[in-house]
Amino acid sequence: MAKIYGDEDASLEPLEDKTVAVIGYGSQGEAQAKNLRDSGIDVIIGVREGGPSWERAKKDGFEVLPIPEAAEAGDVVHILIPDEVQPQVYREHIHDNLEKGNALGFSHAYNIHYGLIEPPEYVDVILVAPKGPGHMVRKLYTEGFGTPALVAVHQDYTGEAMDLALAMAKAMGFTRAGVIKTTFREEVETDLFGEQVDLVGGVLYMILYAFETLVEAGYQPEVAYFETLHELKLIVDLIYEKGLSGMLDNVSNTAEYGGLTRGKRIINKEEMRKVLEEIRSGEFAREWTLENESGRIVMKRLREEIENHEIEKVGERLRKMMGFED
C-alpha cells in the first residue's frame, strides 16, 4: 500500500530561513516558484541572462540571477529546465556552486536515475513531482486546493531530506491533494512508460490508425474525425471524473459491449512489456541522448508526418467550424 501524505503530515519549518533557487522559468518553474513565494518561502530565479524568461520573471516580481549566482545563493537548488539540457547546465553552472548541506530538487527523476547528473555526496537530492502541467499547478493552488504529487529521496546527507521534500510539496500546495512516497526509479520509469504507451504515443497512434482505417475504407474524413478524435474528450472526461466503471455506466450498452469484446484485440501487451524493458534497461535514455546530439532528426521527421497528416487538415477546418480556433 502506498504511503500518502496529507497537509497535516508536512511542515514548512524545514524551509524556514532557507532560499529556494528555482532554475528555469517555464511552465513548471513559474508555477512552482509562485506557489512557493505565496506560501512565504524566499524564492530566487536562475535563468539565462537577458532571455525572455529573465524578463518575465522580473516582471513577476522575482529576484532574477544568472544560473551560477542563483545556485550559489540557494540553499535548495530546484532544477526545472528541460531534461535534455539539465546535464550540461548542471555541470557548467551548478555543481561547483553547491555547498555542504544544500539540497538539489527535481520534478523529474530522469537525469539522476540514468546517471546523467552525478551530485556530490554532501548534498541532499530530492524529488517533488506534481502530476499535472504548470498552469494547473498554479490554478489549483490559487483556488485553495492543489495538484497531487510524488516525493522521493535519492540522497539524504543531512538526515532531513524527506522532511524537506514534504515541506516543498506543502509550500506548493501538493499535500492538500495528497502526496505519494515513491523512488526516483519508480517515478521515471512509470512516467516514461505512461507517456510512451498511452498518454502520448498510444493515444496519438490509436487515433491516427483508427482515422486512416475508416478513410481508407471509403468513409468521409470529417465523419471519421468526429468518431476517432473529437469524441475522445467525452470519454476521457468520464474516466477522469468517474473511473473506468463509471465511464462504462455512462455509455450505451452497445458501446460497452463492443468496447469490452473488441478492445483487447487492438492492444498488444507484449509490445508494452518491450517498451517498459527499453525504459528500465536505459536503452531509451541512451537513444534520447543520441537523438539530441544529432539535432533531433528522427523526432523532427515524425513530427512533420503528424503535422502534414490529413487528420490535422480536417481537424483544423472542423475546429474552426465549432468555434475552437480563430
Curated annotation (Swiss-Prot):
EC number assigned by the record: 1.1.1.86
Catalytic residues identified in the record: 108
A Pfam cross-reference name: KARI_N
Cofactor requirements of the protein: Mg(2+)
GO MF terms held by the record: ketol-acid reductoisomerase activity; magnesium ion binding; NADP binding
Binding residues for Mg(2+) 2: 191, 227, 231
Domain KARI C-terminal knotted: 183-325
Lineage: superkingdom: Archaea
Location of the KARI N-terminal Rossmann domain: 2-182
Binding site for substrate: 252
Catalytic activity field: (2R)-2,3-dihydroxy-3-methylbutanoate + NADP(+) = (2S)-2-acetolactate + NADPH + H(+); (2R,3R)-2,3-dihydroxy-3-methylpentanoate + NADP(+) = (S)-2-ethyl-2-hydroxy-3-oxobutanoate + NADPH + H(+)
InterPro entries: 6-PGluconate_DH-like_C_sf, KARI, KARI_C, KARI_N, KARI_prok, NAD(P)-bd_dom_sf
Residues binding NADP(+): 25-28, 48, 53, 83-86, 134
Recorded metabolic or biological pathway in which this protein acts: Amino-acid biosynthesis; L-isoleucine biosynthesis; L-isoleucine from 2-oxobutanoate: step 2/4; Amino-acid biosynthesis; L-valine biosynthesis; L-valine from pyruvate: step 2/4
Keywords: Amino-acid biosynthesis, Branched-chain amino acid biosynthesis, Magnesium, Metal-binding, NADP, Oxidoreductase
Residues annotated to bind Mg(2+) 1: 191, 195
One GO biological process term: L-valine biosynthetic process
HAMAP family in alphabetical order: IlvC (MF_00435)
PANTHER family: KETOL-ACID REDUCTOISOMERASE, MITOCHONDRIAL
Family per similarity comment: Belongs to the ketol-acid reductoisomerase family.
Described function: Involved in the biosynthesis of branched-chain amino acids (BCAA). Catalyzes an alkyl-migration followed by a ketol-acid reduction of (S)-2-acetolactate (S2AL) to yield (R)-2,3-dihydroxy-isovalerate. In the isomerase reaction, S2AL is rearranged via a Mg-dependent methyl migration to produce 3-hydroxy-3-methyl-2-ketobutyrate (HMKB). In the reductase reaction, this 2-ketoacid undergoes a metal-dependent reduction by NADPH to yield (R)-2,3-dihydroxy-isovalerate.
Protein name: Ketol-acid reductoisomerase (NADP(+))
Organism: Methanopyrus kandleri (strain AV19 / DSM 6324 / JCM 9639 / NBRC 100938)
Name of the gene: ilvC
